[in-house]
Amino acid sequence: MKRWHINASLFAGALLLFAGWNDPVSAADKKYTIALIPGLTTDAFYITMHKGAQAAATALGVDLVFQGAPKFDPEQQVPVLNAVIGRKPDAILIAPTDKTQLVSPLKNAAASGISVITVDTFIGNGHYQTGTGDADFPLSYIASDNILGGQIAARALAKAIGEKGKVYVSNVKPNVSTTDQREEGFKLEMKKFPNITVLETQFNDDDANKAAAQFQAVYARNSDLAGVFGANLFSASGAANGVRQSNAQGKVKVVAFDAPQSIVADIKAGNIDIAIAQHPAEIGFYGVVTAYAHLTGQSVPPLIGTGFTVIDKTNVDDPNVKKFIYSD
């Protein structure tokens, strides 16, 4: 999948100039409303994304509406989406909680004239504006390259365990686009390490307590367990709790995907060894800027990628790294 890496500040600056160039139907004469629907409202990742989106909205004179469900669940997200569609914003930025179940309601949004952009997660296969399939209608997908993120996590864990031993993935549930890809990238990269055995993935339904219990069960069956990759916040924090409860700190290495304050605290406490931080503020910022670009008549790329920062005990207090720790 090809990635478009665009400097957010330059992109926003170009748009601000565009607003000044445009004629009477420009953004200066119309107040746009953009809705941001996160995967869930209580996760530090999405809170940080909201802050990035708000920064762009303020700079561009856009009204930003933030509304979501408290749980990462399509059954809870779809009613929120339908309510937002009823208010007829100019654009919707959404982190779909299922790559198939959100297709139909998002089609309804697009059919009603609302521009649709997905952030963090995608629908279908994430390839938009191709003219093929029933889920290519969103304008753009803005996110981390999650396959690459999984590969980075695998390399970090392999190094931490001396490139040998048993590991497993603690994951949410199947059919979540981002975590599916992180697991895919992790397993793909681990094939390069013949002395590492990847055990069966443990799905925890985004429940940290369940992830902790699963760690204890896997560890009981595999006393030589060397590492765990937590594919999202609750998977990683649950695995870390399991490590602590099993007195396995130092013996079993934990790599976390995402870097809220709680994960940082676990790094400092020795329960988590490494965190792969996404840049959610950039995702939110790009989302608003991309929506604004489209609404003001500019073409936008169908895919925009953001980066990662690897955090461990050696750099967790470095100011250049701390800025990528998520907001609570």
Positions of predicted regions on the chain:
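Basic/polar N-terminal segments that are highly enriched at the extreme N-terminus
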Residues: 1-3, 19-28
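A residue-level marker of the well-folded mature domains of exported/periplasmic proteins
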Residues: 26-328
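Bacterial N-terminal signal peptides
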Residues: 9-20
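Bacterial N-terminal signal peptides that target proteins for export
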Residues: 1-11
